[in-house]
Amino acid sequence: MPNFEQNQVIAVGLSGGVDSSVAALVLKEKGYEVIGLFMQNWETDSKDPFCTAEQDLSDAKAIADHIGIPLYVVNFSKAYWNHVFQHCLDEFAQGRTPNPDVWCNREIKFKSLLDHAKKLGATHLATGHYACIQNENNEYRLLKSNDSHKDQSYFLHLLNQYQLANSVFPIGGYQKSEVRAIAKKRGFINHAKKDSTGICFIGERKFKDFLNEFLLAQPGNIETSEGKIIGKHDGIMFYTVGQRKGLHIGGRPDAGEAPWYVVDKDVKRNVLIVVQGYEHPLLYSQELTCTNLHWIRDTEPSFPLTCKAKTRCRQADQTCVVTRLDNDHCHVQFEHPQRAITRGQSVVFYLGNECLGGGIIN
């Protein structure tokens, strides 16, 4: 983490979780003036059993009081709906699988929240992300966290130079175990709080039930890769490539015992295509094309580019060659076949520890 002048004001996005809490503590103990910001991105009934916002706010208030910093609650639900949620609905409706966290970071946390922090007099916005920022001659680089298991650079690959220049990741150099140990030692009530998982606006409720509230499902056929109809689906928007659960087509007398997996979605015919076996060849591909390209540095890399890539956040880095097709499309050729490459997800590129940027798989 860079050293700033001691009189600088740094705003911290306090989520109520342990990571942002320790991030605020680290800054406070370094002598900075710290203010906390709690985002409300989703309007919900306070009695909603699946929404944790009320408890999260309570935890954030307790941590702010514990550390001795002010906490401001800011509502970005309208911006979130317009710039994140509506985009996700459009993607689901077209049979793709979007990643809301990627868009939320670019449009809400490091745009709306950063702007609000500036209005309050803060010079920078800090978050509890596991990633690092390096300033190299006034060009900012996004680097992986020291904790490879918790690294979140994948979700931050759409950030630009202005956003990185005005952001701080105080725990990027820590291990998650260290963060929890610090929180426990300091008596934080959330030191053992579980990490948030899944899509933030859905919470722990069933994905299918939630999506049904906003999109009209169109049931259709489930077919094998040979075109044989073997079942019915509830709507292809509910499924993603590589999915096994929820197909309800197992135990067929005319098929083996191997489980079925979604291999493709034919949106035009409203057909879900499946194959049997985790290692089925059709689940693997050695290439993809991507669009909506974003490069973190001001100048994009030279092509063809030999680098590493991820097509999902927890995946090990995969060697590939990236070739420019046109202004907004690249072809990615992997050294080894990749399982369950999914349209709508992000492919993110790395050189060593540096996140270069990425695009949307199409």
From Swiss-Prot:
Catalytic site positions: C104, C200
Site feature Interaction with tRNA, where: H129, Q345
Subcellular location: Cytoplasm
Cystine bridges: C104-C200
Interaction with target base in tRNA, as annotated region: 99-101
Top-level enzyme category: transferase
Predominant location: cytoplasm
Record's keyword terms, sorted: ATP-binding, Cytoplasm, Disulfide bond, Nucleotide-binding, RNA-binding, Transferase, tRNA processing, tRNA-binding
A single GO molecular function term of this UniProt record: tRNA-uridine 2-sulfurtransferase activity
Sequence similarity: Belongs to the MnmA/TRMU family.
Listed name of the protein: tRNA-specific 2-thiouridylase MnmA
Organism: Coxiella burnetii (strain RSA 493 / Nine Mile phase I)
